Regions:
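Extracytosolic ligand-binding ectodomains
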Residues: 1-171
C-alpha cells in the first residue's frame, strides 16, 4: 500500500497532508509529484512528518547542452537565480519551435511539421549552433538542455529523464 499525492504546495498541499497525518496516515509510504519537489511550505506544514517520503520530477542529463543552458540562464538573470524545475524542458520546447520556424516557415502548420525533423537526423548541435545550421538550410539535430530530444512520428518524446527525490530533514 502507498499514497500517491498529486499536490501543489500553496493551494492543496498543506491541508491535505495535515488532514491525512491527523488521521494517522504517516506509516504508509507517500510518493509525491513534481508539484511539491521544491516546496519549503509543504515541509514546514508537515512538521517533519514527511521525512523519508519520496517523489518523482522531471530531470536532466548532465551534458554540454545543459551547461550551455545554465550559463545562458545565469547571464539572463545576472547570476541571481539557478535554473528551476521544468526550465530546461521549456527551453527545449521553445528552441524546437524556433528552429522549426527558421527552417520551415513561421505559420503554425509549418512549425509543427518541422519539429520532428529538428529533433533528429542531421548534424548534432546546441543552441546557437543549431540556429546557424537552420539559417544555412542544413539538416540539424537539436541536442536538448534536458537531454537527448528525439520525437516520434506523432511529435511525442521517445525518452525522458526523471529524478527520484527523497525528503530529508528540512530539504
Amino acid at each position: 500500500d502507498a499514497i500517491v499525492a498529486i499536490l501543489f504546495p500553496d493551494t492543496t498541499g498543506c491541508p491535505i497532508v495535515q488532514g491525512a497525518f491527523e488521521q494517522g496516515l504517516t506509516d504508509i509510504p507517500w510518493y509525491f509529484t513534481d508539484g511539491v519537489k521544491d516546496s519549503a511550505t509543504l515541509i514546514e506544514c508537515s512538521q517533519g512528518a514527511l521525512e523519508g517520503f519520496k517523489g518523482v520530477a522531471p530531470g536532466v542529463s548532465e551534458s554540454a547542452a545543459l551547461e550551455s543552458f545554465k550559463a545562458l540562464y545565469s547571464a539572463a538573470t545576472n547570476g541571481e537565480n539557478e535554473t528551476f524545475i521544468f526550465a530546461p524542458q521549456a527551453y527545449d520546447a521553445a528552441m524546437l519551435m524556433i528552429l522549426s520556424a527558421i527552417a520551415n516557415g513561421t505559420d503554425g502548420k509549418s512549425i509543427a511539421g518541422g519539429m520532428i525533423a529538428a529533433s533528429g537526423g542531421g548534424t548534432p548541435c546546441i543552441g546557437a549552433e543549431c540556429i546557424d545550421l537552420a539559417l544555412a538550410g542544413e539538416d540539424f539535430d537539436y541536442v536538448g538542455a534536458s537531454g537527448p530530444i528525439d520525437l516520434d512520428a506523432n511529435g511525442d518524446p521517445t525518452a525522458g529523464t526523471y529524478d527520484i527525490y527523497q525528503i530529508q530533514g528540512s530539504d
